[in-house]
Design a protein with these regions (language model features):
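Structural motif
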Residues: 42-50
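C-terminal accessory helical subdomains adjacent to catalytic cores in phosphodiester-
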Residues: 1-6, 17, 21-37, 51-65, ...
Length: 161
């Protein structure tokens, strides 16, 4: 039996999970990507349980990642105690969406990020969490390289990051 590569992305909320599902559709990688929404229930035992549930054989390679906002300090401590890669946004996931439309270098609150996102481009005016319109999906795909470049210039774990 050959090894299967599985990526488990445990998300804080439905918006993050929707984005992970978009990535799966766009890139059609030869690996299995499983997303789960955990919210505040995330813990080392939670990550271990879901990782073990995905293994069919000992050869399976399950890599776990946690996709969370950094705007709640109590959750940040729980995340750091888990055996998983961290995919963190500070203050919130919408910062990643905003970076597709404009640069953001100064500290902002989650509410300010969402307002800036809605003001950044007509495609985002009616942004609603967890649902992306077809135009928003197209915008994200087109501007991902720019967003990556902008994100690379942010300091890890600082606001914004």
């Amino acid at each position: 039996m050959r090894m299967r590569k599985i990526i488990l992305v445990i998300c804080e909320g439905e918006t993050e999970e929707s984005y992970v599902n978009l990535l799966k559709r766009w890139y059609k990688l030869p690996i299995r990507i499983v997303s789960r929404v955990a919210g505040t229930r995330v813990s080392p035992s939670f990550v271990e349980k879901w990782t073990n549930e995905l293994k069919i054989s000992r050869e399976d390679d399950v890599q776990a990642y946690l996709m969370y906002d950094m705007d709640v300090e109590a959750i940040n401590e729980k995340l750091r105690s888990c055996k998983a890669g961290l995919l963190l946004s500070n203050p919130c996931f919408e910062l990643w969406l905003l970076l597709h439309a404009k640069d953001q270098r100064s500290a902002v609150s989650s509410d300010e990020v969402i307002k800036a996102l809605r003001d950044s481009n007509p495609v985002w005016q009616r942004y609603a969490k967890s649902v992306f319109t077809d135009k928003q999906k197209d915008f994200l795909k087109e501007y991902t390289p720019i967003a990556i470049d902008r994100a690379m210039h942010l300091a890890e774990f600082d606001n914004p990051s």
